[in-house]
């Protein structure tokens, strides 16, 4: 028995929207009997791409989070459905029967991820099917995965130890998008944005000369990290937990250590950190 899933690496996603566009191309105006009815022209995003703005000037960032149906093993939509209108295939894919689901708007309301949509014209709920019709025809992956130019989406069988997705799931730190929902989602993520701290180091005097190659260490929240400033004296630490207090130490030979403490109520820009000669 298989458990098909997608592993989404947020670190790789560049927001090209190929996944969204290829999904629309596959489903808009196209019926796949027993699998799905055609998407309407407006209002449905079976593969959403969320743009997350992070940080503050002059250290802003943008992250992109692709978001399909999570194909949950404890799917609230299945509990809300009547007459078997939502079911799980033997390969783990959660499907909505377009005929049995007619009139069942409760299926839409049951999804905590908000990835099930109501087709007003046809009066049915609709969502991502992981291109089950393609898989059953012998294709190896959904359209969204096939069209990703940076390999941010990896599809495969989680129960096949030889599959790429199984190997990556073991070697990387994967997580659910919203673990507090307790839905045991098959779709997993790498690199969901947390908080980050950034700053720039300069030497006192010399008109604020950049300080490249300077050691910067960070402790707190169970972390003990170290980096060096780049050619412009900039540094950054990613993956910091919310509402944690951290200590940052900047040290360079011949200069006094500079210590900063901060709490991650949000992303932090420490600005210019000046190193004084000893």
Where does each model-flagged region fall?
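Iron-sulfur cluster-binding cysteine motifs and their immediate structural context
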Residues: 18-36, 74-100, 106-123, 140-161
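Long, compositionally biased charged/polar accessory segments in the mid-to-C-terminal portions
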Residues: 144-196
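Extracellular beta-sheet/turn segments enriched in Thr/Pro/Gly and aliphatic residues
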Residues: 186-187, 262-278
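Short, ordered, surface-exposed loop/turn motifs in non-cytosolic proteins
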Residues: 195-197, 204-221
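Short Pro-Gly-centered beta-turn/loop motif in secreted/extracellular proteins
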Residues: 211, 236-247, 253
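A short, solvent-exposed loop/turn motif at the edges and junctions
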Residues: 249-261
């Amino acid at each position: 028995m298989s458990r098909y899933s997608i592993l989404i690496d947020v670190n790789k996603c560049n927001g090209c929207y190929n996944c969204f566009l290829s999904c629309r191309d596959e489903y808009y105006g196209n019926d796949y009997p027993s699998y799905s009815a055609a998407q309407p022209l407006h209002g449905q995003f079976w593969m959403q791409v969320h743009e997350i703005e992070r940080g503050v000037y002059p250290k802003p960032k943008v992250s992109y989070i692709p978001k399909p149906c999570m194909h949950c093993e404890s799917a609230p939509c299945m509990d809300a459905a009547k007459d078997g209108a939502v079911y799980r295939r033997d390969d783990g894919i959660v499907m909505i029967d377009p005929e049995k689901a007619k009139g069942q708007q409760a299926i839409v309301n049951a999804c905590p991820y908000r990835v099930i949509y109501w087709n007003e014209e046809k009066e049915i709920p609709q969502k991502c099917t992981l291109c089950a019709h393609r898989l059953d025809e012998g294709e190896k992956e959904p359209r969204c995965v096939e069209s990703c130019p940076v390999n941010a989406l990896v599809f495969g069988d989680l129960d096949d130890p030889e599959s790429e997705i199984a190997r990556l799931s073991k070697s990387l730190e994967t997580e659910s998008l919203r673990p507090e929902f307790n839905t045991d989602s098959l779709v997993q993520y790498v690199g969901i944005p947390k908080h980050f701290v950034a700053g720039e180091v300069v030497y006192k005097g010399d008109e604020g000369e950049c300080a490249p190659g300077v050691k910067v260490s960070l402790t707190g929240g169970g972390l003990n990290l170290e980096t060096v400033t780049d050619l412009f004296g900039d540094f950054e630490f990613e993956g910091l937990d919310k509402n944690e207090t951290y200590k940052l130490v900047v040290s360079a030979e011949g200069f006094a250590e500079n210590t900063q403490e901060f709490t991650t109520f949000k992303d932090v820009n420490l600005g210019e950190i000046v190193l004084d000669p000893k």
